[in-house]
């Protein structure tokens, strides 16, 4: 295949703007899918991806297309996830392309995540051209949306392709635009092999499968290859392309996209963004931009039924094979037993992993409240990173604590601005700017502590704006904050699973809500139970569950007052003794309640 007849492109779109359906139409039009294989969202392989209508793992597909100029082209569609949690995967997938289709819903207009991904594409020097999808809808306003694209993103949209993926309108025009507007890859097949690894996953029978875009050189079956970041060498057992099913080819050359199977056992070795080269004749400079992805949000996962611990461990190990950005380590809690502390890229990532565990492995799980990574600077001059309240050192050792901040951009119709500003202020946000993109669409930019966003920010944003707002965020930096550890004590004993790290100004209100919630949930005992919220030794809120009391005077009809007094005193003594030895079993609901208070 001549390199000037190759086009590598991706589709950039916000959730629900019709990206996967458009990909289906392109596959059908170029004959990559027969009628028999047709199914909606062909590239979204996981059930979860189909149900939520989102793309989680990148996929690629090779399309053969004969253009109007009579030449045959190979078009490589590299499907990217659209969600903010997977930004790094998106940026690597985009780095494998020369161009992109910006798909915008003609009835909705530009959304926050579209914007974030377009900027990523422009940073990677991609040639981007707009496509207005869903023009068959009665609510479609192509002219308004074209104007929006020009105003907000600064792309020339006067000749944007009008399409409807559902009805199959505009498919040919899109393919022609790809051939005309997107430049062919640059690369030298004679140079040493240099390829960008932009996705990898684990296959039960063949080990790790790598998706790579060749920048220079040629890769043949049987070649000895090396991954630059780890320096390990492997033999290329199979080389091929997805069309859209796996098909082996004798070789891949510069500019092409394909898969390599090299008997790699662990996905953690095949890191996204790494450079693949020949062992004997390596390239001199690896590709830039490789970074290790670090989890930002942590949460404990515990099996409701403790006998499922082993199953949970195996399930996590299997998920880890496909998702190297997810991390876990065992932890124990006095209240919940044995479980794992897991790290995720963000909230959506966390939900997806939990749902996959419950769905694919039939596990029943409890998840503790999500937390973020704090930096604790100690008086003796060192700094430690912690991700749960139980790791926080005693107050007297701490100099100060820092927490991560994010820059959030929220797109919303203008009637909801007031509610959103109030929400951001409540979450200790710092306002950066408010931009009116059009008379009815507003972009609000805030700096927010990630700690506040993880809990319930997204849900509340959606409910304030009736689902119309879209949120995108990027990580900013760490800042010094007045953070304290709040303990929940029951009869004077700290319950470790209920401790949390919280801002001092909010501790009093949270403590009050928590203890009153717990009061409803703890069953009454034969003795009274004190529930307290405390910071260090200072109790900031308290509720008491009153004791159940047996009527010891029932057997005395009339009779002497001293007799009654003796019985009451005896009962009082007994209660006192019981309180010293009695312990309270916390019901499962109490732990879930903690999470609910946050909602």
Swiss-Prot record:
Catalytic activity as recorded in UniProt: GTP + H2O = GDP + phosphate + H(+)
EC id: 3.6.5.n1
Major enzyme class: hydrolase
Positions contributing to GTP binding: 16-21, 133-136
Localization in the cell: Cell inner membrane
Annotated Gene Ontology cellular component terms: plasma membrane
Key word Membrane present: yes
Residues of the tr-type G domain: 4-186
Source organism, top-level taxon: Bacteria
Membrane topology: Peripheral membrane protein
InterPro entries assigned: EF-4, EFG_III/V, EFG_V-like, EFTu-like_2, G_TR_CS, LepA_C_sf, LepA_CTD, LepA_IV
Keywords: Cell inner membrane, Cell membrane, GTP-binding, Hydrolase, Membrane, Nucleotide-binding, Protein biosynthesis
Family annotation (SUPFAM superfamilies): EF-G C-terminal domain-like, P-loop containing nucleoside triphosphate hydrolases
GO MF term (any one): GTPase activity
Pfam families documented for this protein: EFG_C, GTP_EFTU, GTP_EFTU_D2, LepA_C
One GO-annotated biological process of the protein: positive regulation of translation
Protein role: Required for accurate and efficient protein synthesis under certain stress conditions. May act as a fidelity factor of the translation reaction, by catalyzing a one-codon backward translocation of tRNAs on improperly translocated ribosomes. Back-translocation proceeds from a post-translocation (POST) complex to a pre-translocation (PRE) complex, thus giving elongation factor G a second chance to translocate the tRNAs correctly. Binds to ribosomes in a GTP-dependent manner.
Protein family per UniProt: Belongs to the TRAFAC class translation factor GTPase superfamily. Classic translation factor GTPase family. LepA subfamily.
PANTHER family the UniProt entry points to: TRANSLATION FACTOR GUF1 HOMOLOG, CHLOROPLASTIC, TRANSLATION FACTOR GUF1-RELATED
Record protein name field: Elongation factor 4
Native organism: Geobacter metallireducens (strain ATCC 53774 / DSM 7210 / GS-15)
């Amino acid at each position: 295949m001549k390199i000037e007849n190759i086009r590598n492109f991706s589709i950039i779109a916000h959730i629900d703007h019709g990206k996967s359906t458009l990909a289906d139409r392109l596959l059908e039009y170029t004959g990559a899918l027969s009628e028999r294989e047709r199914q909606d969202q062909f590239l979204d392989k996981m059930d979860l991806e189909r149900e939520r209508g989102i793309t989680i793992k990148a996929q690629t597909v090779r399309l053969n297309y004969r253009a109007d100029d009579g030449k045959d082209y190979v078009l490589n569609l590299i499907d990217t996830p659209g969600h903010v949690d997977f930004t790094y995967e998106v940026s690597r997938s985009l780095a494998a392309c020369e161009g992109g289709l910006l798909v915008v819903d003609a009835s909705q207009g530009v959304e926050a995540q579209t914007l974030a991904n377009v900027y990523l594409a422009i940073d990677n020097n991609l040639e981007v051209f707009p496509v207005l999808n869903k023009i068959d809808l009665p609510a479609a306003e192509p002219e308004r949306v074209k104007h929006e694209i020009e105003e907000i993103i600064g792309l020339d949209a006067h000749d944007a392709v009008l399409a409807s993926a559902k009805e199959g309108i505009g498919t040919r025009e899109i393919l022609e635009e790809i051939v005309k507007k997107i430049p062919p890859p640059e690369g030298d097949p004679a140079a040493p092999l240099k390829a960008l690894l932009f996705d990898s996953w684990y296959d039960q029978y063949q080990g790790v499968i790598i998706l790579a875009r060749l920048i220079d050189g040629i890769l043949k079956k049987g070649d000895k290859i090396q991954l630059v970041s780890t320096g390990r060498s492997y033999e290329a057992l199979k080389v091929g392309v997805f069309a859209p099913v796996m098909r082996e080819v004798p070789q891949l050359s510069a500019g092409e996209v394909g898969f390599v199977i090299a008997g790699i056992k662990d996905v953690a070795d095949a890191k996204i963004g790494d450079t693949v080269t020949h062992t004997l004749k390596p390239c001199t400079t690896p590709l830039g931009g490789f970074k290790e992805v670090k989890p930002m949000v942590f949460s404990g996962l515990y099996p409701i039924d403790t006998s499922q611990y082993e199953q949970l461990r195996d399930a996590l190990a299997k998920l880890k094979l496909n998702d190297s950005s997810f991390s876990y380590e065992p932890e124990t809690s006095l209240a919940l037993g044995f479980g794992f502390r897991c790290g995720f890229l963000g909230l959506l990532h966390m939900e997806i992993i939990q749902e996959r565990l419950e769905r694919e492995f039939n596990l029943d799980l409890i998840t503790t409240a999500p937390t973020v990574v704090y930096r604790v600077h100690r008086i003796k001059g060192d700094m430690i990173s912690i991700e749960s309240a139980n790791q926080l050192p005693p107050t007297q050792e701490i100099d100060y604590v820092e927490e991560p901040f994010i820059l959030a951009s929220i797109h919303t119709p203008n009637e909801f601005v007031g509610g959103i500003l109030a929400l951001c202020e409540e979450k200790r946000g710092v306002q950066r700017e408010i931009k009116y993109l059009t008379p009815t669409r507003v972009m609000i930019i805030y700096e927010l502590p990630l700690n506040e966003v993880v809990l319930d920010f997204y849900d509340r944003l959606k409910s304030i704006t009736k689902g119309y707002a879209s949120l995108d965020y990027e990580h900013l930096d760490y800042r010094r904050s007045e953070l304290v550890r709040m303990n929940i004590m029951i009869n004077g004993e700290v319950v470790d699973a209920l401790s949390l790290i919280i801002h001092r100004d909010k501790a009093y209100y949270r403590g009050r809500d928590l203890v009153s919630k717990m009061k409803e949930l703890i069953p009454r005992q034969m003795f009274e139970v004190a529930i307290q919220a405390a910071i260090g030794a200072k109790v900031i809120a308290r509720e008491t569950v009153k004791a159940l009391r047996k009527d010891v005077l029932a057997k005395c009809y009339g009779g002497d007052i001293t007799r009654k007094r003796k019985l009451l005193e005896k009962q009082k003594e007994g209660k006192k003794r019981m309180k010293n030895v009695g312990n309270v079993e916390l019901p499962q609901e109490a732990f879930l309640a903690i999470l609910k208070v946050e909602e």
